[in-house]
Amino acid sequence: LDHDDLLQPQAIYRVAQCVLADDPDMLYSDEVLVSPDGSQVLQYFHRPAFSPEYLRSHPYIVHMVGFRTALLRQLGGFDETLAISQDYDLILRVSEAASRIAHIPEILYQWRTHTGSAGHEKMAQVMATSTAVLQRHLERTGQQATSVSGVSFNFFEPRHQIAADQRVAIIIPTKNYGHLVRQCVDSIRATTK
C-alpha cells in the first residue's frame, strides 16, 4: 500500500478470506487508477491469474499485495539498494520461492495518480532499473535469457537463447480460417531471427 492510496472497505476482509481458504505465500488483487482527489476512475486493472511468463514481460502485480511474513523475512525484504523498482524485484523474488500465489479477482485498491510519482516523472529510470531487476531474476532462475525493454513503458522482452539445432514449435489456432495461417507465417518470417 502506497502512502497516498486507498483500500476499498472490504479489502481486509477479502484478504483474510483468501488467507484462510488458500494459505498463499503471496496474494494480490485488482485495482483502479483514480484521479488525485479520488473522485474519478481513470482506468481499471483486472489482473490475470498468476503467470510467471507474463510477470517477466510486465510487472502487472503492483498494488494490494500481501506476503507471508516468514517468507518475506527469509528473502530479506525489500532491496534497499534499489531506489526504484524495489517492489518488482521483491515480487519476482517471492514468486521464485512461493508455493502458492493467489489472485483475488476483485477491485480492492484505489491507486491515486499524481505528477510526482516515479511512473510519471522517471520513466527512463524505471525502465532501466526494472530491466536490470528482471535480468537478475532470469539469472537466479537459471534462464539463458537477456532482458530488454519492450515496445512500451513497463513492458519487457526476455529474449531466450535458443541453440542453432534446437527446434521451436509454434501453434497457430485458426480453426477453419486458412488465410490467417498465411498472415501468421508471414509475420513470423518477418520478425524472427
Regions found by a protein language model. Give the residues of each.
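Catalytic metal- and UDP-sugar-binding loop of GT-A-like glycosyltransferases, i.e.
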Residues: 1-3
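Conserved donor NDP-sugar-binding/catalytic core segment of glycosyltransferases
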Residues: 6-42, 70, 113-114
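Acidic/His-rich active-site region of diverse nucleotide-sugar glycosyltransferases
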Residues: 28-64
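Conserved nucleotide-sugar donor-binding catalytic segment
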Residues: 51-132
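Cell-envelope/extracellular polymer assembly enzymes that use nucleotide-activated donors
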Residues: 89, 166-171
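C-terminal, non-catalytic tails of nucleotide-sugar-dependent glycosyltransferases
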Residues: 123-165
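Active-site beta-to-alpha loop of glycosyltransferases that engages the nucleotide-sugar donor
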Residues: 172-183
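Short, acidic, metal-binding catalytic loop of nucleotide-sugar glycosyltransferases
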Residues: 186-193
